[in-house]
């Protein structure tokens, strides 16, 4: 946002789950669905307002009294939390860090001021209306976090290209795990809704769905992309949309090629954000069913059988 924004702070009164919270739902976990008494994380006990002006810095402050600090220090209160809301229309802000700063004066030494800082435990975003699910697209990230599930078709034999058939001495060629050097899903980015355009890099993660019959809350395997995931810059969903993004899945494909009958792992992958949720912005890609849809890229090394004299 380019101009001043008025912000309001209130103390929550209802228990909520940071991974599943929405504008109307405080908790939406397995066998536990609880709505907010008031849509929008309400009701709250109003604490105060402040104005953030980007021309004056990147931080905003709310003044708290000792009673509110004491209430938030009660770890037995599962409803404790704070709602920060924008009171300015047509403004979009991303809260990257929240700190509770305490200036205390010990009774034993009243001439001394001690400054303490407490980091936040959980954070999420609620808003209304939530964008409609894409009719034939892939969406990753946002808050609540969007995920996309793909069934991957792994070929057991290759019939081309012609250069491969010549190198192998003919086709079809059986695809073996040891001959696979690299495998990746290639996604083509697209421009999403303006209000949800990423302004920072997004870390894409890929995990194997361990039980497809348990979707949409199926358990997932370990990350196939590492700690930080596959990083994609924000321009890929704006000025540089239609960019090809590769997400390596080599070990996943090797495991499928090497699996035995009756012990085949699931061929379903979940595409998600590394950190969920981190902002309302999400990544958009073209979905299956058209020329810009996901593509499986394979790099193999093959050689002809040779006979020694």
Model-flagged regions — what are they?
Residues 1-309:
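Secreted, disulfide-rich extracellular signaling modules
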């Amino acid at each position: 946002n380019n101009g001043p924004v008025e912000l309001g702070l209130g103390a929550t009164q209802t228990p909520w789950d940071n991974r599943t919270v929405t504008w109307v739902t405080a908790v939406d976990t397995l066998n536990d669905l609880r709505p907010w008494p008031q849509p929008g994380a309400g009701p709250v006990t109003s604490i105060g307002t402040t104005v953030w002006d980007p021309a004056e810095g990147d931080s905003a402050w709310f003044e708290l009294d000792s009673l509110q600090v004491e209430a938030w220090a009660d770890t037995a209160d599962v409803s404790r939390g704070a709602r920060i809301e924008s009171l300015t229309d047509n403004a979009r802000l991303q809260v990257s860090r929240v700190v509770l700063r305490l200036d205390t004066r010990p009774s034993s030494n009243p001439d001394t001021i001690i400054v303490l800082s407490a980091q936040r435990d959980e954070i999420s975003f609620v808003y209304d209306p939530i964008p409609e699910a894409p009719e034939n697209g892939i969406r990753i990230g946002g808050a609540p976090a969007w995920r996309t599930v793909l069934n991957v078709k792994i070929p057991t034999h290759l019939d081309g290209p012609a250069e491969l058939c010549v190198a192998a001495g003919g086709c079809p060629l059986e695809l073996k795990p040891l001959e696979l050097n690299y495998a990746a899903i290639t996604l083509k980015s697209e421009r999403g809704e303006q209000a949800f355009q990423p302004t920072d890099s997004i870390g894409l993660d890929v995990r194997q769905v361990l039980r497809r019959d348990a979707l949409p809350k199926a358990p997932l395997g370990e990350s196939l992309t590492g700690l930080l995931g596959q990083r994609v810059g924000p321009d890929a969903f704006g000025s540089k949309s239609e960019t090809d993004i590769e997400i390596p899945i080599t070990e996943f494909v090797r495991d499928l090629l090497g699996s035995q009958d009756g012990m085949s792992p699931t061929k379903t992958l979940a595409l998600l954000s590394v950190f969920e949720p981190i902002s309302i912005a999400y990544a958009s890609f073209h979905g299956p069913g058209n020329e810009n849809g996901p593509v499986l890229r394979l790099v193999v090394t093959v050689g002809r059988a040779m006979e020694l004299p």
